[in-house]
Amino acid sequence: MFNDIGPLELVTLVVLAVLVFGPDKLPKMIQDVTRTIRKIREFSESAKQDIREELGPEFKDFEFEDLNPKTFIRKQLDNDELGLKEIRNGFDLKKEMAEVTDAVHGRESETSASSSSANGSAGGTVDMTKKREQLEADERPPFDADAT
């Protein structure tokens, strides 16, 4: 329950409790809080026990922690990531991005050059660069109202 509270936060909570409740009422407040936490835990355990009794003997080993989606999926997959490690290792983001930037800038990357030479002339490369039309001296460039 308090695994994610650091030492500085704990000291801050103690100082804040002393300031709010005062040193006289603080022991009584601590007792009240611990009593309330115990009652909540007892209520939770009795509810879990009632659910186990209602489910019957075939669910005797049922764990409520398995209802957490992460735990449920991890248990169902048997800690096997269904080949996700191979997919992650096979996907090289830097290489893919280099190929995309080379294609955008009109250069041919090493991998696409080797694949096109292996394929021969069967699949020609597509030039994705925009060709600029040369305008005559007195001609105005085309105007695009949506571009402004």
Swiss-Prot record:
The chain crosses the membrane at residues 2-22. Its main location: membrane. The keyword Zinc does not apply. Pfam families: TatA_B_E (PF02416). Disulfide bonds: none annotated. Part of the twin-arginine translocation (Tat) system that transports large folded proteins containing a characteristic twin-arginine motif in their signal peptide across membranes. Together with TatC, TatB is part of a receptor directly interacting with Tat signal peptides. TatB may form an oligomeric binding site that transiently accommodates folded Tat precursor proteins before their translocation. This is Sec-independent protein translocase protein TatB.
